[in-house]
Amino acid sequence: MMTISLTTIIAGAVVVLLAILGSLINPFLRSLRFTDEEESLESREPISVIITAHDNLYELEHNLQMFLQQKYPADYQVIVVCQSTDGETLDYLKRMAAENPHLYYTYIPESSRYMSRKKLQITLGVKAAKYEWIILTEPTCTPSNDKWLYTMTRNCQEPNHLVLGYVALDEATKGVRRFDSIRKAFYLLRRAQLSYGYRTHMPNVAFRKSDFMREQGYQGNLEYVRGEYDFLVNKYAAYGDTAVELDCDAWLIHDEPTDKAWHNAHLYLQASRKSLTRAKSMKSQMAMDHLFPHLSLIASLATLAYAILMQDWILTGIAGFALLLLLILRTVIAHKAIKHFDDDISILKLPFYEYGIIWRNLANKIRYWRADKNDFTSHKL
């Protein structure tokens, strides 16, 4: 007669319980709210779109046209702010502006070398904007269709002062990077929907010119070279006045980032995040989301190894079941959550993408520790 020891019962119960907790404590179970498909008012307010460029002639040639071909019932302007030394880009913009009344371009002087040129470009673009509502984006992005502006601006009304849009990475981008971007969106966009916006990694942000000018733009963050979208949301988001637009017609498509651009974005975040407020609750939530899946994985593997060593086949079966339960549940939950945003990410790779996050984060921290910290400051202050 087979007897089941107390150790087997307790260890088996613990690993199964941890597998359940490790599956349910999950950012992909905290769903995002999607806007009702019913359209709001047919009319729209005039709006300005700001694109900041630096050595982005190729991207502008491929992406700018779609910004200029939006079907929009009111006037809109696309302001491209480049640098005075970028002669080829200025020549291209001059030709395009002659053909399209929506396009306006300007540049920052070469002498602006002791402050963040990116933030100076944005500030100059805001001052040049004719309209109250402004959408800020990048030359490496393009609208998914000609309804982008119309769909994005349905939120540009009272009581909103900030609108966060979604940006999908081009399908040529590595699956793990597309996964990481979507996972961050579940934290950051949901946070903006529920309370205060914390930051955004997606360059599709609408804000009010009057707010930006009244609060002196990037004052408080000028010492950092980048972090312009993070700080914009962190400074200007208030409780209840931030909208999130997830309709696929409002998406922007981001060109495949180079390895350098991808890693630099993480390095600049490491440098500038210390200036962001409202970070504690986000960090605590993310820590819990990492702790329980990894604790469950380690417990299941350790129990499985122990059970095999002790030839406790009942416990071996329970530990194996707990391990499979954890991996299958997390994979199914992640796949169901992200398929709205990207249905091309392999379901078989999802467990590796999820459990690789802490190692990718560690690699980013090591790169930052080894980097020259002066590279992240403008030396202005």
Go through the PLM ranges and name each one.
Residues 292-374:
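Membrane-embedded multi-pass helical conduit in multi-pass membrane proteins
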Residues 162-164, 168-184, 219-285:
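Catalytic donor/gating beta->alpha subdomain of glycosyltransferases that bind UDP-sugars
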Residues 100, 104-112, 117, 121, ...:
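Long helical/loop segments within the catalytic core of UDP-sugar-dependent glycosyltransferases
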Residues 65-112:
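Acidic donor-binding segment of Leloir-type glycosyltransferases
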Residues 138-154:
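Acidic donor-binding/catalytic loop of UDP-sugar-dependent glycosyltransferases
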Residues 122, 134:
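Short aromatic/hydrophobic "clamp" motif used to bind/position activated sugar donors
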